[in-house]
Amino acid sequence: AFYMAGRLYGFDFTPVPAGSVPGFHPDVEVFEVTNKSDGSHVGLFYSDDFSRAGKRSGAWATTYRSYSTYDGVKNVLSSNNNNFTKAEGGEPILISLDDAQTLFHEFGHALHSLSAAYTYPSLGGTPRDYVEYPSQVHEHWVLSRPILDGFMKHVETGQPMPQSLVDKIEASGTFNQGYDTVSYLSSALVDMDLHTQAVPPTDIDAFERASLARLGMPREIVMRHRLPQFNHLFTSDAYSAGYYSYLWSEVMDADTWAYFEESGDVFNPAIA
């Protein structure tokens, strides 16, 4: 991921000496982010990759401080948080392809924060339609040939992933796509239905069933997030009536990736 950021945006990530910058857990690694062109300081990146007792599940990105200049230059403090499993007994740490794509996804959010430049932090921000685009688009680089040849190697032989296997993985990307699309889209539509009610429903389960019935939801497919555990909607207002942005972002990131591929260089800095 750091290699990708360097090629696309000219960022360097340098480990900060242990203990020189406070972290919120011993597992957290801190990196200083600088511009390759002039060595100027961009911010700090906190990498919290491993699961532990008391840590919430899933993966997420956090911006503790955004860039601003209204009261002197304030640089970015950003973190990525994953739940990878630590290896035991000196074994190498292995992650799945899905984990690797998640890592690049969350790193895209961090790159978005690190690239932002505005005077007043209160006037910064991202339209909900766009907020998942910077994360989802960076997932495409996981299977790019330079990343595969440099980093995605067999743990025992050191050989990079063969292109024949990459082709099969990419071909499998459309498997069950109809199911996945309906699962995602039903969650987005029920979200919109819920947030356009003049009177909030008191029986959320009954509302969900009625909403899905109006949509003609196939019985064989379930929502990606049932309403009782739809954290995107209820842990904050961030995604209220906005869960559709994940699907809309897929449209934008597919178009972007096609543009990179058509240029003949998926690390084309002029496009980035």
Where are these regions (language model features)?
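Cation-handling catalytic/transport regions enriched in His/Asp/Glu
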Residues: 1-272
